[in-house]
């Protein structure tokens, strides 16, 4: 039923009325979501007007009967503006739903799904490798994995244990439990997403007569799982995204007799209306890097897309994440209506479930560490546990109460039940199974199974209904709705939509390739049709074929970027992954054709390649065919691998092998027998051979150089001279092209079209692999949350538990350690914390008339409007407001963290201006938990303590303080745990505690700012965080904290509240009061409706001021505040604080400074707490540690350098000193340079990781200087560069045999040492060049593209493909600028200079001397002038002459001279130093905020203005907008 899911969001149904016995059908016209970030396209006033109109409409329609303004009963034929028009304000969702349901019934019975499960168990397989991988222990991991594989030692890990339940069609189930309890696994199991997890054999599931195997296979799209992450194509509009989903599941014969496209468009419009995103129809979806709709709107796009899948059984995993509680309630009410009218069954996991949302559900399942402790009606759950002996506080919501039962620190037994209530998950599960409710459930399951036997009547009805919707051309058991051709067509249209939406990459590549063609064409401009162009023509065709072949290498990255989306759509049964693969390849063909024409046309005619129509079109044919072959090859690699790392590693070596064995760098005759097969399997080799044949076959080339020639040989005729080129015949002034390629390359004309056929075969083979792998190989299986420790530091509690099934490193849920209460109890320091160690604070921070203005699209916008307030020691102040009110922006302004716009107003510490040290004396806990993933918890805290506490405090004292904070935050049990990444490392709560700890160990002397500390956490964790903050304030900490719609219990923990309306306007600042009484009284006396008993004051307050969805207030609350006596009191208090504290502060400051030395006073008010030298040592050690603990980075370097060295070394094994041997040695150096790009791609992501952490958290808190950041990252690469140099030296230098060339002049050691130094300079240049390029660029990908372009330029102009003397005059400067010029000269001269040349048989030139002369007599003058040697000087016929006798002659052809070796070495140091200086300069120019230092601290705060340079405004604004809620998508 492709339309059924639309009902998920239709209308707003009030479940509480039905529960109380009121008639069914209380509906508003649509679901109104208040967005996290309002749309950038609408000014604030427009948003407010829209909210007011929506509220008015809601009030009109919320009554027992719905007023119908259009008598039409055809859901698809309606008048514009009627109540069936999705774009009308009168749209009546309930009426539309009823009519749609009736229309569907005329086409046959609607499909419905429910399920029962008995003894449901789910398991995975894990291993014991739960220690941190480092460069040192990674080999041990490999050995252990091999042992496990051979011995099949993987442990079975039980995730879910013996669960039972039943969900009828049209029922809603809420799944409650803390992270790690099994909620996600349960939903995935129901929906059939069993990637890496397995059903126990004893499990029994019945989907109304359908077996699990069938629901996971042929009915895959009928039960879907929607994850909490939002994955979409960022450059498609919302309309395009949802249209695609609607068309993919549109039935074969839509109701109403309309076409499938009309049906899909109508369904899209309805869904957008229902979810309140109609205004985003033509707005791109966006993501974290591409600006599009806001985060809340993107979440609704995800929900709408899943709704359009039309599944009768839907599983939603924390889909309300990113929505505030009011919008979460709206989402659940929409699901309720969907269930009641369309019969859709849904199972929903919610971490923070408001009571109103909970009331929408029929049933609840409570999970506790993989055990089911309740399943039944939502109305029965609370009483069940109360009867068991637990106490539910009056102000605690039912879902919070149920979740709290899984936390030993939160659950409370009723009086008289101490010691009688269960305490472990197993005891809870046992009590549940002994209860009457459990017996009732078993009876319901038995009744369900009797009613719906497997493959019974309901199964046949379901099958017939599904088949009626499917295309006629589908096989009977296909889960898809469209035929395969229809799927390809749909994906193809989407592909071209994506191309039109973002043509930048395509156009950039076209332009870049055109520029490259111009550059290469100008380097080889107008080649003469003589033998002097032979080498150049070969080099040109070699480079041209490589450009055609490797232009598709980026497709690996592109495919991985969309892989998650394709797999999601496959789970929804939108299309076969292979259909998208076909469409993706077809979408790229126009670009490939254009690129082939633009690049090859320019190159071909600029360089004077064979100007014949047939030759030109054959050149184009081979180039395009090879492009397609290589595209399929790279796509096959991407689809065969499960992760990007797995794909890139073999791709790098494959590229090297393909280039090496093309036939130019090593010709066929010189390929070693054991490596010849690589040439046979190399598609590029066949293309290169055909192009060489195409260029040289049947052509005669004028000889440009004869032997002998010059003075004394003017009369040489006939066979007395010969052209100095392979294939020449004595006496002939021309050389046959066929003879040249036959002798030099062993290429033959008969292979020309054969090779084309082989390329077609390669194309078909790789295409088949690509499509097959895409269809059957999914991305890497996910692992659950586990804690990772350095080897040898795993806590005994974890080691003990690892012998059992729980807590595996592969535990999909991972709650057995990371979130499990039993384990948590054993390893945490609960009840031992001493919060008294927190530094007592005495300073009062106050602000008055704070205004913040910025420019958006050249229009001024006020973000904060005359905000007043203060934070006193020992108080916890909440900062709340509607979405877009500027809460985070106010924190940033107060903490001196904004670097753009204009800030005015007073911000005082004890009545005095903030000084330069203000930022490092305050703690700022950001919403994002950013930490270096390789550090342990203790190391992260020590790093902060060392650099941010005063330098006068000893290291020992700092470390002792860290230990105290670990105990205070109850982190000592996992102090040695590695931060890791989400899933493999700290869980959400542990990360939040670490974020707070990093700021606490800095001993903030003034106050602590926290931005949304409970965001994304479950209710239990949120409560723990608030209790921690409360504990801190009780010991003197001053805290200002933003929070988004807290529960009533959380809200009561705050002392004061600063509430902002949209536009940064103050609505209230004052005490909250016991039971929120003071706050409630203020609003009630100023016109708000009375707060009902038991209502959450935070939610009531939002509704009172008109900020909740669908609500509106006639009171101007900002103006009310301005005119209130409370504000007058606030202003008076601010004046008093400034007067009294200012005087005290001045006196205290003088006394304190009097007792200190001048140096101590200077240090106290310095920008950084530690001196630069100390910063450098500490930061350098951390960067080094990061590298050591990222074995994938270092071992990838080792693998690349060693395998490339061995590959090149043995491909040119024992290269001789013949002319071909010398050319091989030249190309062995050239090929070694090709690893430059891969090394760069390895360095840049690590640098960006460090930089992100530094810029977002460490720089604003003044932890250390940006200069130290750059230098430490550069210096840390030096040891690894030295190690890689040693590896390359031994794997490359000795196999090729360079050392043998130094034996004649007894310089083996000197030249060997020089070669090692040059290798090190190559690697040092690579490291510093990489950091210089990425220093000022946002992403590693962009920097990598720029680096590759510059690298290509350096390679083209280094003198190998075209010598400096042969370059056009215009490009000579590039030859001089390229650092590779000096690397090639230095390395090659040191490698082969000053030794003899020994020609091979085919390199000798044969001619006859004049009658009566010997060969030696005839050639003596020529040899004296030009060099070379004769085989037999006394011969009188058939003189065999080698045109070179010394390797220096060969080197001179490339303008390489051994005498320049030390000059070149010195110049390379100049390049390295330049890179370092440029890296520092570029970073300062591009990324260091300007004018944020002394000027800000010294200027009077009431006139302070800061305007950022124009070039950084937009980027910085985007950063602020994502965190501040002050801007819109």
From Swiss-Prot:
Signal peptide: none annotated. This is ABC multidrug transporter AFR2. Belongs to the ABC transporter superfamily. ABCG family. PDR (TC 3.A.1.205) subfamily. The keyword Methyltransferase does not apply. Disruption phenotype: Does not affect the susceptibility to azoles, but displays slightly lower minimum inhibitory concentrations (MICs) to cycloheximide and higher MICs to rhodamine 6G (R-6G). Causes further increase in susceptibility toward fluconazole and itraconazole, when AFR1 and MDR1 are also deleted. The gene is AFR2. Residues 1493-1505 have a biased composition (Basic and acidic residues). It comes from the Eukaryota. It catalyses: itraconazole(in) + ATP + H2O = itraconazole(out) + ADP + phosphate + H(+); voriconazole(in) + ATP + H2O = voriconazole(out) + ADP + phosphate + H(+); fluconazole(in) + ATP + H2O = fluconazole(out) + ADP + phosphate + H(+). Disulfide bonds: none annotated. Keywords: ATP-binding, Cell membrane, Glycoprotein, Membrane, Nucleotide-binding, Repeat, Transmembrane, Transmembrane helix, Transport. Its main location: membrane. Pleiotropic ABC efflux transporter that confers resistance to structurally and functionally unrelated compounds including azoles such as fluconazole (FLC), itraconazole (ITC), posaconazole (POS), and voriconazole (VRC). GO terms for cellular component: plasma membrane. Glycans are attached at residues 235, 318, 742, 1434. InterPro entries: AAA+_ATPase (IPR003593), ABC2_TM (IPR013525), ABC_trans_N (IPR029481), ABC_transporter-like_ATP-bd (IPR003439), ABC_transporter-like_CS (IPR017871), ABCG_PDR_1 (IPR034001), ABCG_PDR_2 (IPR034003), P-loop_NTPase (IPR027417). It is a multi-pass membrane protein. It is found in: Cell membrane. Induction: Expression is induced in the presence of fluconazole (FLC). Pfam families: ABC2_membrane, ABC_tran, ABC_trans_N, PDR_CDR. The chain crosses the membrane at residues 510-530, 539-559, 589-609, 614-634, 648-668, 757-777, 1193-1213, 1229-1249, 1268-1288, 1314-1334, 1353-1373, 1465-1485. ATP binds at residues 881-888. Residues 1518-1529 have a biased composition (Polar residues). It comes from Cryptococcus deuterogattii (strain R265) (Cryptococcus gattii VGII (strain R265)). GO terms for molecular function: ABC-type transporter activity; ATP binding; ATP hydrolysis activity.
């Amino acid at each position: 039923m492709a339309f059924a899911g639309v009902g998920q969001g239709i209308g707003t149904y009030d479940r509480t009325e039905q529960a109380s016995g009121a008639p069914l059908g209380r509906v508003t016209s649509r679901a109104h979501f208040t967005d996290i970030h309002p749309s950038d396209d609408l000014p604030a006033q427009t948003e407010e007007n829209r909210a007011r109109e929506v509220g008015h409409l809601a009030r009109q329609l919320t009554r027992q009967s719905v007023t119908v303004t259009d008598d039409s009963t055809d859901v698809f034929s309606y008048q514009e503006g009627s109540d069936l028009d999705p774009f009308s304000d009168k749209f009546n969702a309930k009426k539309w739903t009823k009519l749609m349901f009736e229309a569907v019934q005329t086409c046959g019975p609607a499909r419905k799904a429910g399920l029962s499960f008995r003894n449901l168990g789910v398991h995975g397989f894990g291993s014991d490798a739960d220690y941190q991988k480092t460069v040192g222990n990674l080999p041990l991991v490999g050995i252990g994995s091999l042992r496990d594989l051979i011995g099949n030692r993987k442990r079975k890990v039980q995730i879910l244990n013996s669960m039972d339940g039943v969900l009828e069609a049209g029922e809603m189930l809420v799944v409650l439990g803390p992270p790690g309890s099994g909620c996600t696994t349960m939903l995935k199991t129901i929906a059939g997403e069993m990637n890496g997890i397995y059903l126990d054999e004893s499990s029994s599931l019945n989907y109304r007569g359908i077996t699990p195997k069938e629901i996971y296979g042929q009915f895959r799209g009928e039960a879907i799982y929607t994850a909490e992450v939002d994955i979409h194509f960022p450059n498609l509009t919302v309309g395009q995204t949802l249209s695609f989903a609607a068309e993919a599941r549109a039935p074969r014969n839509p109701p109403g007799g309309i076409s499938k496209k009309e049906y899909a468009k109508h369904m899209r419009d309805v869904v957008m209306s229902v979810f309140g995103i109609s205004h985003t129809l033509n707005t791109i979806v966006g993501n974290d890097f591409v600006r599009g709709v806001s985060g809340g709107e993107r979440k609704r796009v995800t929900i709408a897309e899943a709704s359009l899948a039309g599944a009768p059984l839907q599983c939603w995993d924390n889909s309300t994440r990113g929505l505030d509680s009011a919008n979460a309630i709206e989402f659940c009410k929409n699901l309720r209506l969907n269930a009641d009218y369309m019969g859709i069954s849904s199972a929903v996991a919610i971490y923070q479930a408001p009571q109103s949302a909970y009331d929408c559900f029929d049933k609840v399942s409570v999970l506790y560490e993989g055990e089911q402790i309740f399943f039944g009606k939502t109305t029965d759950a609370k009483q069940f546990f109360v009867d068991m002996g637990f106490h539910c506080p009056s102000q605690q919501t039912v879902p919070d109460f149920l979740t709290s039962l899984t936390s030993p620190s939160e659950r409370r037994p009723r009086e008289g039940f101490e010691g009688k209530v269960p305490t472990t998950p197993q005891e809870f599960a046992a009590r549940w199974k002994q209860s009457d409710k459990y017996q009732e459930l078993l009876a319901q399951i038995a009744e369900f199974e009797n009613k719906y036997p497997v493959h019974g009547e309901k199964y046949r009805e379901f099958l017939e209904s599904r088949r009626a919707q499917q295309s006629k051309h589908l096989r009977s058991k296909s889960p898809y709705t469209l035929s395969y051709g229809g799927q390809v067509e749909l994906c193809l249209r989407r592909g071209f939509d994506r191309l039109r939406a973002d043509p930048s990459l395509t156009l950039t590549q076209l332009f870049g390739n055109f520029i490259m063609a111009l550059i290469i064409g100008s380097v080889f401009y107008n080649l003469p049709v003589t033998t002097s162009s032979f080498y150049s023509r070969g080099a040109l065709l070699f480079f041209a074929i490589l450009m055609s072949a490797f232009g598709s290498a980026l497709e690996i990255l592109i495919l991985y970027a969309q892989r998650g989306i394709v797999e999601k759509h496959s789970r929804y049964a939108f299309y076969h992954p292979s259909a998208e693969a076909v469409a993706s390849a077809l979408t790229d063909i126009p670009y490939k054709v254009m690129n082939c024409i633009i690049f090859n046309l320019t190159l071909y005619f600029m360089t004077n390649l064979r100007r014949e129509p047939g030759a030109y079109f054959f050149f184009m044919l081979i180039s395009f065919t090879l492009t397609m072959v290589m595209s399929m090859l790279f796509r096959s690699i991407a689809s065969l691998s499960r992760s990007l790392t797995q794909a890139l590693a073999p791709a790098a070596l494959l590229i090297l092998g393909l280039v090496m064995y093309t036939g130019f760098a090593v010709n066929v005759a010189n390929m070693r027998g054991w490596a010849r097969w690589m040439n046979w399997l190399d598609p590029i080799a066949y293309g290169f051979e055909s192009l060489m044949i195409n260029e040289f076959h049947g052509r005669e080339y004028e000889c440009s150089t004869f032997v002998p020639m010059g003075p004394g040989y003017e009369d040489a005729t006939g066979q007395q001279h010969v052209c100095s080129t392979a294939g020449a015949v004595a006496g002939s002034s021309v050389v046959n092209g066929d003879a040249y390629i036959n002798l030099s390359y062993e290429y033959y004309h008969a292979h020309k079209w054969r090779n084309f056929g082989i390329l077609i075969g390669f194309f078909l083979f790789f295409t088949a692999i690509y499509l097959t792998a895409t269809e059957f190989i999914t991305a890497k299986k996910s692992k659950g949350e586990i804690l990772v420790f350095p080897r040898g530091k795993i806590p005994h509690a974890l080691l003990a538990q690892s012998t059992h099934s729980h807590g595996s490193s592969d535990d999909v849920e991972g709650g057995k350690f990371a979130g499990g209460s039993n384990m948590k109890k054993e390893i945490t320091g609960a009840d031992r914390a001493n919060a008294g160690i927190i530094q007592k604070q005495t300073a009062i921070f106050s602000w008055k008339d704070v205004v913040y203005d910025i420019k958006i699209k050249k229009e001024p916008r006020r973000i904060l409007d005359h905000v007043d307030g203060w934070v006193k020691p020992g108080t916890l102040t909440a900062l709340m407001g509607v979405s877009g009110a500027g809460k985070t922006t106010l924190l940033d302004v107060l903490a001196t963290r904004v670097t753009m716009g204009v800030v005015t107003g007073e911000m005082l510490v004890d009545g005095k201006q903030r000084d330069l040290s203000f930022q490092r004396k305050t703690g700022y806990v950001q919403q994002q938990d950013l930490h270096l993933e390789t550090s342990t918890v203790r190391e992260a805290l020590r790093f902060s303590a060392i650099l941010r506490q005063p330098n006068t405090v000893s290291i020992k004292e700092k470390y002792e303080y860290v230990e105290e904070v670990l105990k205070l935050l109850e982190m000592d049990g996992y102090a040695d745990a590695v931060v890791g990444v989400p899933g493999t490392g700290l869980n959400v709560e542990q990360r939040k505690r670490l974020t707070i700890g990093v700021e606490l160990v800095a001993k903030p002397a003034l106050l602590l700012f926290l931005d949304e500390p409970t965001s994304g956490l479950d209710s239990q964790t949120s409560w723990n965080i608030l209790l921690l903050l409360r504990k801190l304030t009780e010991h003197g900490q001053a805290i200002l904290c933003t929070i988004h719609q807290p529960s009533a219990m959380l809200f009561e923990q705050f002392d004061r509240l600063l509430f902002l309306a949209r536009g940064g306007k103050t609505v209230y600042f004052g005490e909250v009061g016991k039971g929120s009484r003071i706050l409630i009284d203020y609003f009630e006396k100023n016109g708000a409706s009375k707060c009902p008993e038991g209502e959450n004051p935070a939610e009531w307050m939002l509704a009172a001021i008109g900020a909740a969805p669908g609500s509106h207030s006639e009171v101007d609350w900002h103006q009310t505040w301005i005119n209130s006596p409370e504000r007058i009191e606030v202003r008076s208090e601010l004046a008093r604080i400034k007067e009294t504290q200012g005087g005290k502060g001045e006196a205290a400051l003088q006394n304190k400074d009097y007792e200190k030395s001048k140096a101590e006073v200077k240090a106290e008010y310095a920008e950084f707490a530690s001196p630069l030298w100390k910063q450098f040592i500490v930061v350098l050690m951390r960067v080094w540690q990061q590298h050591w603990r990222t074995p994938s980075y270092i071992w990838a370097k080792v693998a690349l350098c060693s395998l490339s060295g061995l590959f090149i070394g043995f491909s040119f094994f024992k290269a001789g000193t013949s002319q071909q041997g010398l050319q091989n040695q030249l190309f062995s150096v050239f090929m070694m340079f090709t690893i430059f790009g891969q090394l760069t791609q390895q360095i840049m992501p690590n640098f960006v990781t460090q930089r992100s952490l530094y810029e977002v958290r460490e720089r604003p808190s003044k932890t250390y200087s940006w200069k130290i950041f750059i230098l430490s990252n550069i210096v840390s690469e030096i040891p690894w560069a030295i190690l890689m140099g040693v590896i390359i030296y031994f794997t490359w230098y000795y196999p090729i045999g360079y050392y043998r060339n130094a034996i004649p002049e007894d310089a083996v050691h000197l030249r060997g040492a020089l070669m090692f130094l040059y290798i090190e300079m190559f690697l040092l240049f690579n490291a510093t060049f990489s950091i210089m390029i990425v220093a000022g660029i946002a992403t590693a990908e962009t920097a990598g593209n720029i680096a590759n372009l510059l690298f290509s330029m350096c390679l083209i102009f280094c003198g190998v493909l075209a010598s400096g003397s042969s370059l056009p005059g215009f490009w000579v400067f590039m030859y001089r600028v390229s650092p590779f010029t000096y690397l090639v000269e230095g390395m090659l001269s040191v490698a082969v200079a000053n030794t003899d040349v020994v020609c091979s048989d085919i390199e000798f030139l044969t001619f006859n001397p004049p009658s009566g002369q010997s060969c030696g007599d005839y050639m003596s003058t020529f040899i004296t002038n030009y060099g070379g040697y004769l085989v037999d000087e006394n011969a009188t016929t058939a003189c065999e002459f080698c045109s070179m006798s010394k390797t220096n002659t060969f080197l001179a052809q490339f303008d390489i001279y051994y005498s320049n070796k030390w000059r070149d070495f010195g110049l390379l140091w100049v390049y390295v130093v330049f890179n370092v200086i440029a890296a520092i300069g570029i970073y300062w120019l591009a990324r260091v905020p300007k004018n944020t230092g002394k000027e800000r601290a010294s200027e009077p705060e009431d006139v302070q203005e800061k305007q950022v340079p124009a070039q950084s405004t937009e980027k910085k604004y985007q950063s602020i907008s994502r965190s501040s809620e002050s801007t819109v998508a």
